[in-house]
Amino acid sequence: MLAKRIVPCLDVREGKVVKGVQFRNHEIVGDIVPLAARYAEEGADELVFYDITASAHDRVIDKSWVSRVAERIDIPFCVAGGISSIEQAREKLAFGADKISVNSPALSDPSLIQRLQDEFGRQCIVIGIDSYYDEASDSYRVKQFTGDESATKDTQWFTQNWVEEVQKRGCGEIVLNVMNQDGVRQGYDLKQLSIIREICDVPLIASGGAGTMEHFKDVFEIAKVDAALAASVFHKGIIDINELKTYLAQHKIPTRR
Protein backbone atom coordinates (compact mmCIF):
# COMPACT_ATOMS: atom_id res chain seq x y z
CA MET A 1 0.00 0.00 0.00
CA LEU A 2 1.33 3.41 -0.95
CA ALA A 3 1.65 6.00 1.80
CA LYS A 4 -1.61 7.82 2.44
CA ARG A 5 -1.67 11.61 2.72
CA ILE A 6 -3.21 13.75 5.45
CA VAL A 7 -4.27 17.12 4.05
CA PRO A 8 -5.56 20.00 6.19
CA CYS A 9 -7.88 22.31 4.27
CA LEU A 10 -7.95 26.05 4.84
CA ASP A 11 -10.99 27.86 3.47
CA VAL A 12 -10.12 31.52 2.92
CA ARG A 13 -12.53 34.43 2.82
CA GLU A 14 -11.52 38.10 2.96
CA GLY A 15 -7.98 37.22 4.00
CA LYS A 16 -8.93 34.96 6.92
CA VAL A 17 -9.30 31.21 7.37
CA VAL A 18 -12.95 30.33 7.94
CA LYS A 19 -14.98 27.16 8.44
CA GLY A 20 -18.64 26.43 7.88
CA VAL A 21 -21.02 23.51 8.16
CA GLN A 22 -22.33 22.04 4.90
CA PHE A 23 -20.82 25.06 3.10
CA ARG A 24 -22.88 27.53 5.18
CA ASN A 25 -22.55 29.78 8.27
CA HIS A 26 -18.80 30.31 8.13
CA GLU A 27 -16.95 31.52 11.20
CA ILE A 28 -13.43 32.93 11.37
CA VAL A 29 -10.81 30.39 12.48
CA GLY A 30 -7.59 32.39 12.27
CA ASP A 31 -4.88 33.90 10.09
CA ILE A 32 -3.66 32.13 6.96
CA VAL A 33 0.12 32.00 7.37
CA PRO A 34 0.31 31.04 11.08
CA LEU A 35 -2.19 28.22 10.57
CA ALA A 36 -0.31 26.97 7.52
CA ALA A 37 2.95 26.97 9.48
CA ARG A 38 1.33 25.15 12.38
CA TYR A 39 0.00 22.34 10.21
CA ALA A 40 3.32 21.96 8.42
CA GLU A 41 5.08 21.62 11.77
CA GLU A 42 2.48 19.13 13.02
CA GLY A 43 3.19 16.72 10.17
CA ALA A 44 0.71 17.54 7.41
CA ASP A 45 1.69 16.07 4.05
CA GLU A 46 0.34 19.00 2.09
CA LEU A 47 -2.15 21.84 2.44
CA VAL A 48 -5.10 22.96 0.34
CA PHE A 49 -6.29 26.56 0.32
CA TYR A 50 -9.71 27.44 -1.07
CA ASP A 51 -10.64 31.07 -1.62
CA ILE A 52 -14.26 30.13 -1.27
CA THR A 53 -15.94 33.21 -2.73
CA ALA A 54 -13.51 33.96 -5.58
CA SER A 55 -15.41 32.19 -8.37
CA ALA A 56 -18.84 33.35 -7.23
CA HIS A 57 -17.59 36.95 -7.06
CA ASP A 58 -15.73 36.75 -10.39
CA ARG A 59 -12.25 37.30 -8.98
CA VAL A 60 -9.13 35.24 -8.38
CA ILE A 61 -7.06 34.27 -5.32
CA ASP A 62 -5.07 37.04 -3.67
CA LYS A 63 -1.48 36.34 -4.68
CA SER A 64 0.00 38.16 -1.66
CA TRP A 65 -0.83 35.43 0.83
CA VAL A 66 0.19 32.70 -1.62
CA SER A 67 3.74 34.06 -1.65
CA ARG A 68 3.77 34.47 2.15
CA VAL A 69 2.71 30.87 2.64
CA ALA A 70 5.41 29.68 0.23
CA GLU A 71 8.02 31.53 2.26
CA ARG A 72 6.95 29.90 5.54
CA ILE A 73 6.30 26.23 4.79
CA ASP A 74 8.32 23.46 3.20
CA ILE A 75 5.52 21.07 2.25
CA PRO A 76 3.52 21.11 -0.99
CA PHE A 77 0.39 23.22 -1.15
CA CYS A 78 -2.47 23.67 -3.57
CA VAL A 79 -4.53 26.81 -4.14
CA ALA A 80 -8.01 27.23 -5.56
CA GLY A 81 -10.42 30.04 -6.22
CA GLY A 82 -11.43 31.69 -9.45
CA ILE A 83 -8.58 30.34 -11.58
CA SER A 84 -10.04 30.44 -15.09
CA SER A 85 -7.07 31.05 -17.39
CA ILE A 86 -3.53 29.88 -18.14
CA GLU A 87 -2.19 33.26 -17.05
CA GLN A 88 -3.88 33.14 -13.64
CA ALA A 89 -2.63 29.61 -13.03
CA ARG A 90 0.91 30.53 -14.08
CA GLU A 91 0.92 33.45 -11.65
CA LYS A 92 -0.13 31.30 -8.68
CA LEU A 93 2.47 28.66 -9.49
CA ALA A 94 5.12 31.35 -9.91
CA PHE A 95 4.26 32.71 -6.46
CA GLY A 96 5.04 29.34 -4.91
CA ALA A 97 1.99 27.07 -5.13
CA ASP A 98 2.81 23.48 -6.11
CA LYS A 99 -0.63 22.70 -7.53
CA ILE A 100 -3.66 24.61 -8.64
CA SER A 101 -7.20 23.38 -8.16
CA VAL A 102 -10.13 24.28 -10.37
CA ASN A 103 -13.78 23.72 -9.56
CA SER A 104 -16.50 26.13 -10.74
CA PRO A 105 -14.46 27.55 -13.66
CA ALA A 106 -14.06 24.03 -15.08
CA LEU A 107 -17.82 23.52 -14.93
CA SER A 108 -18.28 26.75 -16.88
CA ASP A 109 -15.57 25.82 -19.40
CA PRO A 110 -14.49 22.15 -19.30
CA SER A 111 -11.84 22.78 -21.99
CA LEU A 112 -9.91 24.72 -19.33
CA ILE A 113 -8.76 21.40 -17.85
CA GLN A 114 -7.10 20.29 -21.08
CA ARG A 115 -5.47 23.68 -21.60
CA LEU A 116 -4.03 23.68 -18.09
CA GLN A 117 -2.74 20.15 -18.52
CA ASP A 118 -1.12 20.99 -21.84
CA GLU A 119 0.61 24.01 -20.32
CA PHE A 120 1.70 22.76 -16.90
CA GLY A 121 1.38 18.97 -16.91
CA ARG A 122 -1.23 16.72 -15.35
CA GLN A 123 0.68 16.42 -12.06
CA CYS A 124 -0.24 19.89 -10.81
CA ILE A 125 -3.86 20.08 -12.01
CA VAL A 126 -6.42 19.20 -9.34
CA ILE A 127 -10.16 19.23 -9.92
CA GLY A 128 -12.43 19.95 -6.98
CA ILE A 129 -15.94 18.54 -7.18
CA ASP A 130 -18.71 19.67 -4.83
CA SER A 131 -21.05 16.70 -4.74
CA TYR A 132 -24.48 16.73 -3.13
CA TYR A 133 -26.61 13.68 -2.43
CA ASP A 134 -30.16 14.36 -3.58
CA GLU A 135 -32.43 12.08 -1.58
CA ALA A 136 -35.47 12.66 -3.78
CA SER A 137 -33.75 11.27 -6.87
CA ASP A 138 -31.28 9.04 -5.00
CA SER A 139 -28.43 10.50 -7.01
CA TYR A 140 -25.20 12.42 -6.55
CA ARG A 141 -25.22 15.80 -8.28
CA VAL A 142 -22.53 18.44 -8.82
CA LYS A 143 -23.09 21.98 -7.55
CA GLN A 144 -21.32 25.16 -8.63
CA PHE A 145 -20.30 28.39 -6.85
CA THR A 146 -20.75 26.74 -3.45
CA GLY A 147 -18.57 29.25 -1.60
CA ASP A 148 -21.41 31.79 -1.60
CA GLU A 149 -24.81 30.36 -0.71
CA SER A 150 -26.59 33.15 -2.60
CA ALA A 151 -24.74 32.14 -5.79
CA THR A 152 -24.76 28.33 -5.42
CA LYS A 153 -26.53 26.54 -8.23
CA ASP A 154 -27.20 23.07 -9.56
CA THR A 155 -25.43 21.85 -12.68
CA GLN A 156 -26.37 19.38 -15.38
CA TRP A 157 -23.78 16.90 -14.13
CA PHE A 158 -24.23 13.76 -12.11
CA THR A 159 -21.10 13.32 -9.99
CA GLN A 160 -20.05 10.06 -11.62
CA ASN A 161 -20.32 11.55 -15.11
CA TRP A 162 -18.31 14.63 -14.16
CA VAL A 163 -15.58 12.48 -12.58
CA GLU A 164 -15.25 10.59 -15.85
CA GLU A 165 -15.27 13.80 -17.88
CA VAL A 166 -12.53 15.58 -15.94
CA GLN A 167 -10.28 12.54 -16.21
CA LYS A 168 -10.74 12.44 -19.98
CA ARG A 169 -9.76 16.10 -20.11
CA GLY A 170 -6.53 15.62 -18.20
CA CYS A 171 -6.81 16.25 -14.47
CA GLY A 172 -4.11 14.84 -12.21
CA GLU A 173 -6.11 14.48 -8.98
CA ILE A 174 -9.69 14.78 -7.82
CA VAL A 175 -10.90 16.19 -4.52
CA LEU A 176 -14.44 14.99 -3.84
CA ASN A 177 -16.11 17.46 -1.49
CA VAL A 178 -19.18 15.71 -0.10
CA MET A 179 -21.44 18.62 0.80
CA ASN A 180 -23.90 16.67 2.97
CA GLN A 181 -21.08 15.58 5.28
CA ASP A 182 -19.16 18.86 5.40
CA GLY A 183 -18.36 20.10 8.89
CA VAL A 184 -20.70 17.72 10.74
CA ARG A 185 -17.90 15.33 11.80
CA GLN A 186 -20.00 12.17 11.36
CA GLY A 187 -17.59 10.39 9.04
CA TYR A 188 -16.75 10.44 5.35
CA ASP A 189 -19.38 9.30 2.84
CA LEU A 190 -17.88 5.86 2.33
CA LYS A 191 -20.62 4.72 -0.04
CA GLN A 192 -20.21 7.62 -2.44
CA LEU A 193 -16.42 7.58 -2.24
CA SER A 194 -16.34 3.84 -2.96
CA ILE A 195 -18.54 4.35 -6.02
CA ILE A 196 -16.25 7.10 -7.29
CA ARG A 197 -13.13 5.07 -6.51
CA GLU A 198 -14.30 2.41 -8.96
CA ILE A 199 -14.26 4.89 -11.86
CA CYS A 200 -11.39 7.11 -10.74
CA ASP A 201 -7.97 6.26 -12.16
CA VAL A 202 -6.19 9.31 -10.76
CA PRO A 203 -5.47 9.99 -7.07
CA LEU A 204 -8.72 10.53 -5.17
CA ILE A 205 -8.89 12.79 -2.11
CA ALA A 206 -11.81 12.46 0.29
CA SER A 207 -13.26 15.64 1.77
CA GLY A 208 -16.12 16.18 4.19
CA GLY A 209 -17.06 14.47 7.43
CA ALA A 210 -13.91 13.68 9.43
CA GLY A 211 -14.60 13.69 13.16
CA THR A 212 -12.49 10.92 14.67
CA MET A 213 -9.29 9.05 13.89
CA GLU A 214 -11.42 6.03 13.05
CA HIS A 215 -13.06 8.00 10.25
CA PHE A 216 -9.65 8.39 8.61
CA LYS A 217 -8.92 4.68 9.03
CA ASP A 218 -12.26 3.76 7.48
CA VAL A 219 -11.93 6.03 4.46
CA PHE A 220 -8.50 4.58 3.67
CA GLU A 221 -9.47 0.95 4.29
CA ILE A 222 -12.98 0.92 2.84
CA ALA A 223 -13.06 3.62 0.17
CA LYS A 224 -9.40 3.13 -0.83
CA VAL A 225 -8.78 6.84 -1.27
CA ASP A 226 -5.26 8.19 -1.68
CA ALA A 227 -5.59 11.11 0.72
CA ALA A 228 -7.99 12.44 3.32
CA LEU A 229 -8.71 16.13 3.60
CA ALA A 230 -10.15 17.67 6.76
CA ALA A 231 -10.59 21.07 8.33
CA SER A 232 -12.56 21.49 11.55
CA VAL A 233 -10.95 18.58 13.43
CA PHE A 234 -7.57 20.20 12.87
CA HIS A 235 -8.67 23.81 13.34
CA LYS A 236 -10.33 23.00 16.67
CA GLY A 237 -7.52 20.76 17.92
CA ILE A 238 -9.77 17.69 18.07
CA ILE A 239 -7.16 15.59 16.24
CA ASP A 240 -3.39 16.04 16.28
CA ILE A 241 -1.83 15.10 12.94
CA ASN A 242 1.17 13.26 14.41
CA GLU A 243 -1.07 11.28 16.75
CA LEU A 244 -3.33 10.47 13.80
CA LYS A 245 -0.40 9.10 11.83
CA THR A 246 0.66 6.96 14.79
CA TYR A 247 -2.89 5.62 15.07
CA LEU A 248 -2.99 4.80 11.35
CA ALA A 249 0.38 3.04 11.57
CA GLN A 250 -1.02 0.87 14.38
CA HIS A 251 -3.72 -0.18 11.93
CA LYS A 252 -1.17 -0.93 9.21
CA ILE A 253 -2.04 2.13 7.13
CA PRO A 254 1.21 3.73 5.97
CA THR A 255 1.64 7.50 6.00
CA ARG A 256 4.58 9.78 5.37
CA ARG A 257 6.57 10.47 8.55
Curated annotation (Swiss-Prot):
Family matches, as InterPro entries: Aldolase_TIM, His_biosynth, HisF, IGPS_HisA/HisF, RibuloseP-bd_barrel
Identify this protein by name. Answer: Imidazole glycerol phosphate synthase subunit HisF
What gene makes this protein?
A: hisF
Q: Which SUPFAM superfamilies match?
A: Ribulose-phoshate binding barrel
Q: Which PANTHER family match?
A: IMIDAZOLE GLYCEROL PHOSPHATE SYNTHASE HISHF, IMIDAZOLE GLYCEROL PHOSPHATE SYNTHASE SUBUNIT HISF/H IGP SYNTHASE SUBUNIT HISF/H
Q: Which organism is it from?
A: Shewanella woodyi (strain ATCC 51908 / MS32)
Q: Please state which protein family the record places this protein in.
A: Belongs to the HisA/HisF family.
Q: Which reaction does it catalyse?
A: 5-[(5-phospho-1-deoxy-D-ribulos-1-ylimino)methylamino]-1-(5-phospho-beta-D-ribosyl)imidazole-4-carboxamide + L-glutamine = D-erythro-1-(imidazol-4-yl)glycerol 3-phosphate + 5-amino-1-(5-phospho-beta-D-ribosyl)imidazole-4-carboxamide + L-glutamate + H(+)
- What GO CC terms are in its UniProt record? cytoplasm
Q: What is the role of the protein in this entry?
A: IGPS catalyzes the conversion of PRFAR and glutamine to IGP, AICAR and glutamate. The HisF subunit catalyzes the cyclization activity that produces IGP and AICAR from PRFAR using the ammonia provided by the HisH subunit.
User: Which residues constitute the catalytic centre?
Assistant: D11, D130
As recorded in UniProt, its EC number(s) are: 4.3.2.10
GO MF annotation: an example: imidazoleglycerol-phosphate synthase activity
Annotated localization: Cytoplasm
- Give the Pfam families listed for this entry: His_biosynth (PF00977)
Spell out the subunit comment. Heterodimer of HisH and HisF.
Q: Does the keyword Cytoplasm feature in the UniProt annotation?
A: yes
